[in-house]
Amino acid sequence: RDLTGDWSSDVCSSDLSSVGSVSLAVASSVPGSTSSTVCSTSDCTIAYAESGFIFDVPTLIAARPQSDIALRAVKKSDTSQACVPGFANVTRSLSFTSAYINPGTGTQPVMVNNSPVTSSPSSLNLTFDSTGTTLLTVRYDDAGQMTLAAQYDGTTANGDVGLSMSGSDVFVSKPYGLCLQTASSCTVAGVNDNCQVFAKAGDSFPLRIQAVGWQADGEPLTAGNLCSNHIITPNFQMSDITLNSALVAPVSGDSGTLSPPQYSHVLGNQTTTSTSISEVGVFRLTATPTANGYFGETVSGGESGLVGRFIPAYLGVQANASLTSSCGSSFSYQGQPMAFAIGQEPTLTVTGFNRSASITHNYDRGAFWRLATPVPNAYTSITGKTSLDVSGRLTRSGTANLAQSGADDGDGAERYRWSGETLQYTPALLPLADDYPFIAAIRQTFSAATLTDTDGACFGDGNSCSAYSYDFSDSPGSEVRLGRLRLDNAHGSELQALDLPLRIETWQNLAGGSFRVEGLDTCTTAAVLQTPALSSYTGQLSQQNYGNDKVTLIAPSAGLGLLRLQPPGINGSVLGGLPATPSWLFYDWNGKGREAATGLARFGIYRGSSPMIFRREVYR
């Protein structure tokens, strides 16, 4: 540079657009210098340092503007990061670009001071203060890891042609929360018109999850907020986000298990995962990303609306019952009512199950139990003997008293017990081989309709509804015998007592079928047979002179007893009987149907049959 004029000192400026050093010297002077050049730096060398921009974009929440981000013009080689002279209190035009890092593509620009910044440079006029600092407002309407870069190139107007300054920062933008949605239309938790059946417990249903941006600070992370008027952040992806469920109804019920316990959010507007809940009820679902799991940052999750109602996939049914012998501990007679064994009355247990065959413990909670009281069909005989198993041979009597139990105890089941009835086989009019002693074999059936609740959950394989049958247990059970009470005839002197033999017999498989004395009878007692009676007087006997007080019952023992008639002192005959004889000991004595037995007592000398003359004519 040429310096002319009369002066003792001068100030000049020098700049260099690249990093390096410049040496100063006096090439010539007029008049000439008699001494060497003296500089404030050693060797008269000026060092030019690399300059650039430093700024730090903090972690953003998608769609939420972040203001007051300081961008500073600094000397990069200067550890004190002092401002470069010439950028104080000036306005400069900087070019900004953005780039996708993870994921590597996207659709949204980075907004800097409300101007979109993409991979193509965008110029912004920025005013730097005395410290070389300007403030930025940055917003990004998506999620992911991004780079924001700033560039300044000197101009003639600014007197810094050739100057190049740059700076960049990698930042993370995360969703505000996760919007969880299902096809459930439940708005009021419970069993009502506003919470219809949604799915069966254990069956899969689609759970739709969207990562969404910010709309307002402090907004609750619920579906009602996040799933309405929020932008979607399709660039959000993250693995192993925890899924959970919270029971809303029934209160104090079993929370069940949500499956799967986690999911991976993939790129795109929505991630749909196939989900199932193991229990009956109404729930809310939550998604919770792992803490510090998104580029070192924690992403907020979200909560669904009401999801339900869930019902059992199917109903399981079990039943049991047993009879007990009515004539002691050995057997019952045909026609004799057989009671249910104590504690073994017909009992039906209905249990709700999910698709995995696990009990739905909430099914018996309050109104979630949707099965009306099952109505059993008629009892049927299944002895395998045609005449015994025919419709109508087995009958029941008495009134069934229903007791229902098990509600609200959280085992998913309720029990129905019917008591007060007795069963009996109608006695055969004429004994057959089928009537030899047999074990009572009873089956009870419930129709598919009566085992289907009002939501359609029913007994079956989970795909179709079925009727249910079960067989009575033989423990203790009862053997059944065809029996009769028989009174034999007798005759004797009118001066002596006369006994009519009494025999209790049962039909046995002996000699091709015959009635034999039943020595095991313990139920035909004097109290059962009550007072004997006389009827059908002949000869000199009449009710007036020979009433019921003249006959006495000697109760049967081991199947044998008698009616003892006092001596009348006059001739005649009379029928002795037991009017209170139980109907199961009736028999068709006279071909007129089953009736109680009578025995004929004859007093006096017996003449025998009336004399008859037989004549035979032979024709040749």
Feature-to-residue mapping (PLM):
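Core sequence-specific DNA-binding domains of diverse transcription factors
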Residues: 1, 9-620
